[in-house]
Amino acid sequence: MSNNWEMVIGLEVHAQLNTSSKLFSSSPNQFGSEPNENVNFIDSGMPGMLPVMNFTCIEMAIKTGFALNFNINKYSVFERKNYFYPDLPQGYQISQFEFPILTEGFINIDNEGIQKKIRIERAHLEQDAGKSIHDIDPKFSFIDLNRVGTPLLEIVSYPDLSSAEEVVSYMSSLRQVLMYIDVCDGNMQEGSLRADVNLSVRKKGEELGTRCEIKNLNSFKFIRQAIEYEFKRQIDVIESGGKIEQNTMLFDTSTGETRAMRSKEFSHDYRYFPDPDLLPVNLTQDQIDKVKTSVGELPQAKLDKFIKDYNVDKDIAKIITVEKQNAILFEKMISETDVKPKFIAAWLVGDIFAFIKENSLEVSSLNEKTKEITDLLKLVSDDVISNKAGKEILPKVLNGQGKPSDIVKELGLEQVSDSGELEKIIDEALIGEEENISKFQGGSDRVLGYFVGKCLKATKGKGNPKLINKILLERLKK
């Protein structure tokens, strides 16, 4: 059935900005406070209270403009978006409509090895609304105004997305960029980054269908589920002879289904007009250029550098660059040692990340321990200790139980790498093994593993396996 249909998707992503105060007031911009704790007269819509622009929000929008290839508009205007809801005490939302701060950007996504350019129509600043709470009392609803006035950057894509996988890839890439430039913390669980999905269906090659908007999706899992369900729902309606209504939809996470909340509004329903309490934003080129210097290295540039300059495998480099703190830790480690970056990268995404996960740590917590970590990796890389011994010592090093070299001595884990000593052990191991030696010389490579194991046993596991392997091959080929 769905083989004859295709989905067309555009996304409206709301990113809460990493500011200390709100967009138009001095109230703290922080998550997790007691209800209605971070509210002043401006936030609560008291008569006569005038908004004051937080210019840091403008700077963060400009930074996003550079990171996402936008045109940065020197002239932009804040307007009132008029609608009534209990958690919007002013009776309108201050947003940007006709003259947004950013227009015509794009981001490249990688969906299972397939590259695609996703165009972004616009990004504009606006204030968030409060929160209505309906599950405390069966008779009453409660309002928490802490979120009112929280600065949002709404990033609106063109309908260039055509699958749930592409949408998740787009959201993931967008989140990564915003976190790299320190504009948004990307915490979807707390609502710092959420998406409205505009989805329509059509037969392949036909005109665009009527779209429905699925509101406030705050996890990749829910985005995927909502898209897959809504795609099937719209096809079922059309194939049953029905017509898609332009509705605003809610995704029910308990049932995995979408349902209509209300008919979808058009822009003229909101009666936008310039906010008389706020002057237009007029930026100078100097202001824009000053922000550009703070953008820093973006994820794709870091990925390319790790692959080309440091010879790190692409899949491993992707894991390291997915979070900014991962990349910071990696670059700090390689700056403190002559161990090959590729070797460090393999340990980082393996045992080091495993330790971080098992102990519920922040990656940044290891930034003060990079010297100890790289000292340990140097011992492994130089064959002073085995890879197995390195894995045994790593948790002790990360828990601050001593220097790697001291722990090695204390536990007696230093490898036997003396060629003369190993030659004697190998010669003794080959005594009486004429039959197996003949098998090896006849082409049986498996016998080599048997001999290596025998020699390691003779050294109580402390023999350097690389050196044992080398000497054995020299002996067996004679």
Where are these regions (language model features)?
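Basic, nucleic-acid-interacting segments
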Residues: 1-297, 308, 314, 336-340
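Structural motif
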Residues: 3, 311, 335-344, 384, ...
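Amphipathic alpha-helical segments in well-ordered regions
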Residues: 64, 230, 347, 351-355, ...
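Core structural elements
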Residues: 190-203, 308-331, 341-358, 371, ...
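Extended, non-catalytic structural segments that build the interaction scaffolds
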Residues: 288-294, 301, 332-339, 373-385
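M16/insulysin-pitrilysin zinc metalloprotease superfamily fold
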Residues: 337, 344, 352-366, 371, ...
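Strongly charged, low-complexity linkers/loops
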Residues: 363-378, 387-457
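Short, amphipathic C-terminal "tail helix"
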Residues: 445-478
